[in-house]
């Protein structure tokens, strides 16, 4: 599906943010035996996700209103979950961010699914009930 340049910018930014989140997660796994270092990396992951809503506003402004609302809702959900994990200080919650309960290794995480749907559905992206 053809994407507008504005949507392409949003998708590229989300892909970059996803890569940064995964780098933080991989860094945490690499130091799993060192609890303070593991905690710091998981907090970094959560802070990156918490920033999606605010940082994404500039990308959303350029999109059609319905897509702004739909994509903005998803960014809000990612950010709200991460802010909650940081607020309560749960490292387990931080580690589970982006992964549904039934997630299996090798399956895409929730942010990857969102990015893929934006890429595939373009301006016609709409929320699913599970979103």
Give the ranges of each region predicted by the language model.
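Generic structural concept
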Residues: 11-14, 18, 46, 50-53, ...
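Short amphipathic alpha-helical segments that mediate assembly, nucleic-acid/protein binding
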Residues: 3, 7, 45, 53-56, ...
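Amphipathic alpha-helical binding modules
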Residues: 77-131
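Helix-centric, low-specificity signal for extended rod-like, repetitive segments
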Residues: 2, 6, 13, 38, ...
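Short, solvent-exposed, charged loop/turn and helix-capping segments
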Residues: 49-79
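Coiled-coil heptad-register positions
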Residues: 25, 32, 39, 60, ...
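Short terminal alpha-helical segments
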Residues: 1-43
